[in-house]
């Protein structure tokens, strides 16, 4: 569908919302259409309609792992703000996808629940964490998940068991579909040490990563048997700046926004890193989602 086509939405929408406000990178121009959903019913209605109209759209949570274009997005941005949770049993919890993943980790660990302590150091939403199979070191969301509910193109809610989620290193089935992750059910255990484990993990993250500056987290996936940040550092690129974007001097797998960075500058830095490492026989793959102004 062409952008110029007039759309009459059966629900309220906003125009010209700046995506920089919905990105931890603080980069991004205005969205053509923008809609915040706060319930499963709202999400079902919006998704079914967008698919029926074949209108281009993206789903955004806390915006912690994406780079929006300076021009914005020539389509529909569906902002997920569904933030409920409920215990299904003493050690099983269902959490809706718009909730902060780090908040969930802090809440559970401080209440004596183990299984998601690593979440305290991961910005973003529960849905985003499922989408990326977020984790730290050898811990990831796949190790604690029991099932996921998602909304398909017909607006129907479907359930996937853990074995159906195609989890891999920073991968899930949802990266190859446009299903809306609605909720995740986690298996936990009771532990008196959970709060200390969470505190230690968070402290390590704060010491090693540039959390005081806007960024999108790790830019590249770690290649097998190595660390992208270490390779970028050894290539002499740590601290390299281009305009307002800089390869962090604290952790070389982060690009930070020094207050005036553009998406073009960030993408240029990413390409510089890729080219430099490629010349050494190393191929790096982006972990950050680069969202173009117009979908292909």
Curated annotation (Swiss-Prot):
It catalyses: UDP-N-acetyl-alpha-D-muramate + NADP(+) = UDP-N-acetyl-3-O-(1-carboxyvinyl)-alpha-D-glucosamine + NADPH + H(+). Keywords: Cell cycle, Cell division, Cell shape, Cell wall biogenesis/degradation, Cytoplasm, FAD, Flavoprotein, NADP, Oxidoreductase, Peptidoglycan synthesis. It is found in: Cytoplasm. PROSITE patterns: FAD_PCMH. Disulfide bonds: none annotated. GO terms for biological process: cell division; cell wall organization; peptidoglycan biosynthetic process; regulation of cell shape. Its EC number is 1.3.1.98. It comes from the Bacteria. One of its GO terms (cellular component) is cytosol. Its cofactor is FAD. The keyword Lipoprotein does not apply. Pathway: Cell wall biogenesis; peptidoglycan biosynthesis. Residues 26-191 form the FAD-binding PCMH-type domain. Its main location: cytoplasm. GO terms for molecular function: FAD binding; UDP-N-acetylmuramate dehydrogenase activity. The active site is at 170, 218 (proton donor), 287. Belongs to the MurB family. Cell wall formation. This is UDP-N-acetylenolpyruvoylglucosamine reductase. It comes from Chlamydia felis (strain Fe/C-56) (Chlamydophila felis). The lineage of its organism: Bacteria, Pseudomonadati, Chlamydiota, Chlamydiia, Chlamydiales.
């Amino acid at each position: 569908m062409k952008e110029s086509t007039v759309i009459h939405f059966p629900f309220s929408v906003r125009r010209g919302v700046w995506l920089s406000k919905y990105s931890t990178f603080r980069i991004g121009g205005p969205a053509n259409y923008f809609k915040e959903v706060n319930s499963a019913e709202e999400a079902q209605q919006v998704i079914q309609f967008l698919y029926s109209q074949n209108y281009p759209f993206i789903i955004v949570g806390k915006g912690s792992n994406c780079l929006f274009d300076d021009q914005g997005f020539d389509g529909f941005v569906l902002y997920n703000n569904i933030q409920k949770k409920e215990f299904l049993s003493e050690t099983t919890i269902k959490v809706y996808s718009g909730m902060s993943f780090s908040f969930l980790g802090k809440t559970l660990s401080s209440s004596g629940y183990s299984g998601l302590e690593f979440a305290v150091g991961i910005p973003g939403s529960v849905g985003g964490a499922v989408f990326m199979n977020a984790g730290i070191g050898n811990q990831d969301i796949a190790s604690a998940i029991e099932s996921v509910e998602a909304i398909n193109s017909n607006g129907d809610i479907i359930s996937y068991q853990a074995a159906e989620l195609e989890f891999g290193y920073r991968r899930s089935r949802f990266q190859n579909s446009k299903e809306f992750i609605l909720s995740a059910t986690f298996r936990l255990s009771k532990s008196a040490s959970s709060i200390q484990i969470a505190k230690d993990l968070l402290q390590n993250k704060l010491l090693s990563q540039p959390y005081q500056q806007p960024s999108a987290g790790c830019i590249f996936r770690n290649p097998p048997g190595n660390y992208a940040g270490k390779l970028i550092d050894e290539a002499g690129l740590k601290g390299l700046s281009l305009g307002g974007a800089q390869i962090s001097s604290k952790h070389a797998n982060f690009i930070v926004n020094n207050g005036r960075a553009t998406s073009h500058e960030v993408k240029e830095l990413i390409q510089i890193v890729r080219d430099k490492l490629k010349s050494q026989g190393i191929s790096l793959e982006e972990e950050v989602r680069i969202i173009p102004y117009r979908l292909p």
